[in-house]
């Protein structure tokens, strides 16, 4: 079910003259669009939201939607419909977003505001138990002793979906680069489910829809297990996935062997995209049919990367998708 060659950029959206931002195909795939806010839009947005520190967004959740409206208004109210259309479009479902003039760790608060505004034009970001907020910021360094692969720099973090060990609906994932020092490697890895060469054989396997147990390590601050299958379907009957190799707990030999084979088949796909994400940029993907991971870094004693993530549910046209709940 490799559909990559059949994918064409949405010429209507790409050819349209947009207010406040530029839209273009990414260098990696026509499925991934690159959206850049102009310098003037960036300047006006930051000026209008300067009265609210990030703490205000944490304490008053409605402000997250207010700053989203400010950004959409600056874009002639063209931004929100385009974001929703792109993320719900099975042929795309992914954006690499940046803003001219936001590219330095000293602007970390501004980065959080921008990402929050974008996310709350499509839905709402869920509570993140790891941080205790609607977003999480975390650092990758040269040495790591944590209990998951999230911060381990010298190995590939395998392809996965987010939201596998929580009960909240996780339709989208946003991943932003806040800082990077002494870095080489570590590109984001993406795989669209329809481009995976082995989708048909795994999706039609008897274990594909079997309910399995998912459990997170202590650092995730989630105390109970959840139960769901690896695969499901959307309302059009197309495969969607909810999978991460670290947290699935096979109950027997049959499940363990199948999950191991599934992991190997994902990691050896020839259609994995390697996407550099510079400081200030962020990826926004549909979590149901995109998997994401991270390539390894080259060791350096002063290696440092800071990331910010948000993940949540679509508030528009959500009935188009099953959510495994």
Curated annotation (Swiss-Prot):
Fe cation binds at residues 160, 162, 292. Pfam families: CsiD. GO terms for molecular function: ferrous iron binding; glutarate dioxygenase activity; oxidoreductase activity, acting on paired donors, with incorporation or reduction of molecular oxygen, with 2-oxoglutarate as one donor, and the other dehydrogenated. Binds 1 Fe(2+) ion per subunit. Keywords: Dioxygenase, Iron, Metal-binding, Oxidoreductase. Homotetramer. This is Glutarate 2-hydroxylase.
């Amino acid at each position: 079910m490799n559909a990559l060659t059949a994918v064409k950029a949405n010429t209507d959206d790409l050819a349209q003259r947009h207010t406040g931002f530029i839209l273009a195909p990414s260098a990696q795939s026509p499925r991934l669009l690159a959206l850049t806010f102009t310098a003037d839009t960036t300047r006006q947005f930051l000026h209008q939201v300067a009265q609210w520190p990030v703490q205000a967004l944490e304490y008053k959740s409605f402000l997250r939607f207010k700053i989203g409206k400010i950004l959409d208004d600056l874009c002639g109210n063209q931004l929100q419909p385009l974001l929703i259309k792109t993320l719900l479009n099975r042929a795309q479902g992914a954006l690499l977003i940046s803003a001219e003039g936001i590219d330095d760790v000293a602007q970390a608060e501004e980065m959080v505001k921008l990402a929050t505004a974008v996310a709350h034009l499509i839905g709402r970001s869920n509570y993140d138990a790891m941080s205790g907020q609607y977003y999480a910021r975390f650092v990758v360094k040269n040495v790591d002793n944590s209990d998951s692969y999230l911060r381990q720099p010298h190995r590939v973090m395998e392809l996965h979906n987010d939201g596998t060990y929580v009960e909240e609906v996780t339709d989208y994932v946003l991943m932003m680069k806040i800082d990077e020092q002494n870095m080489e490697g570590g590109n984001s890895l993406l795989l669209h489910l329809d481009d995976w060469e082995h989708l048909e054989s795994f999706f039609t396997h008897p274990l594909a829809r079997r309910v399995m147990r998912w459990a997170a390590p202590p650092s995730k601050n989630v105390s109970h297990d959840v139960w769901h299958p690896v695969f499901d379907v959307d309302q059009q009957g197309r495969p969607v996935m909810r999978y991460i190799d670290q947290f699935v707990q096979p109950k027997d030999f049959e499940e363990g062997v199948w999950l191991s084979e599934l992991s190997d088949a994902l990691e050896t796909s020839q259609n994995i995209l390697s996407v550099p994400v510079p400081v200030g940029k962020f990826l926004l993907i549909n979590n149901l049919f995109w998997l994401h991971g991270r390539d390894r870094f080259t060791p350096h004693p002063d290696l440092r990367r800071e990331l910010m993530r948000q993940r949540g549910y679509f508030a528009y046209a959500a009935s188009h998708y099953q959510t495994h709940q």
